Amino acid sequence: MKKNTLLNAELSYIIASLGHTDEITICDAGLPIPDRSQRIDLALIQGIPTFIDTVKATLAEMQIEGVIVAQEFKTVSPQLHDELMTLVQIEEELRGKPITISYIPHEEFKSHSHQSKAIVRTGECTPYANVIFQSGVVF
């Protein structure tokens, strides 16, 4: 369910069309995206847009109740992982309900991302900078 205004029409449409428990993936520039998945390619050049900016824009619009990240993200790219977790914590406080955080191996993450309604590719080039958001409800 949408919460605010987003300029990218494809991403805005996907968020507006999400039902409870539907998922979208926000990924770095290198995550493989299968042809059968809807790709929203925001990447312009290396680093633009960033993973965190894309997450912020998405969280401004999307009600989430679950987060899935690769286990490797926490150990290989701890600074970016911590930034993401801070944003999730803020979202949890705003929501007033807990947000489930799950860690799975990267290979499993790649397979799981194929179930997403859309995969949003950023210009991020930090290893394992990927997240799956599970849609919640605003009530």
From Swiss-Prot:
Its EC number is 5.4.99.62. InterPro entries: D-ribose_pyranase (IPR023064), RbsD-like_sf (IPR023750), RbsD_FucU (IPR007721). Pathway: Carbohydrate metabolism; D-ribose degradation; D-ribose 5-phosphate from beta-D-ribopyranose: step 1/2. Pfam families: RbsD_FucU. It is found in: Cytoplasm. It is an enzyme of class 5 (isomerase). GO terms for molecular function: D-ribose pyranase activity; intramolecular lyase activity; monosaccharide binding. Belongs to the RbsD / FucU family. RbsD subfamily. This is D-ribose pyranase. It comes from Aliivibrio salmonicida (strain LFI1238) (Vibrio salmonicida (strain LFI1238)). The lineage of its organism: Bacteria, Pseudomonadati, Pseudomonadota, Gammaproteobacteria, Vibrionales.
